[in-house]
């Protein structure tokens, strides 16, 4: 089993020293869903939510969150992100919204946390914008889909 890189020999949490690591191209993709009543999904799709453009706002919130991950997650490095893409797709089969994020960087450490944070905050934003219509919404399945670059190479999640 690999060791936990954020713990020192005494078990204390520390920020990993990446000063000797060469910058490399790194990407990460994550996904999550927010499940809701069919009527709530209809409100979102038809643009009838009282707070405005739910999906556009959630997309921007996810992008902003990725850029601020180092302020939210202890021991996360601040990174100069090259790309953040957040997609919010209505899915009548849930019913709800399927949210995906892709993050890219040329840097010394990966962007998994940035992709996961983008998805998490986008889901929370959807909840906030339509909670008056449906307090029973569920945020589910937030997970890393893929990461590439760095010493550990490629990771791809098993299909859900």
From Swiss-Prot:
The active site is at 128. Pfam families: MoaC. InterPro entries: MoaC, MoaC_bact/euk, MoaC_sf, MoCo_biosynth_MoaA/MoaC, Mopterin_CF_biosynth-C_dom. Its EC number is 4.6.1.17. It is an enzyme of class 4 (lyase). Substrate binds at residues 75-77, 113-114. GO terms for biological process: Mo-molybdopterin cofactor biosynthetic process. Pathway: Cofactor biosynthesis; molybdopterin biosynthesis. Transmembrane segments: none annotated. Homohexamer; trimer of dimers. Catalyzes the conversion of (8S)-3',8-cyclo-7,8-dihydroguanosine 5'-triphosphate to cyclic pyranopterin monophosphate (cPMP). HAMAP family: MoaC_B (MF_01224_B). Belongs to the MoaC family. This is Cyclic pyranopterin monophosphate synthase. It comes from Methylobacterium nodulans (strain LMG 21967 / CNCM I-2342 / ORS 2060). The gene is moaC.
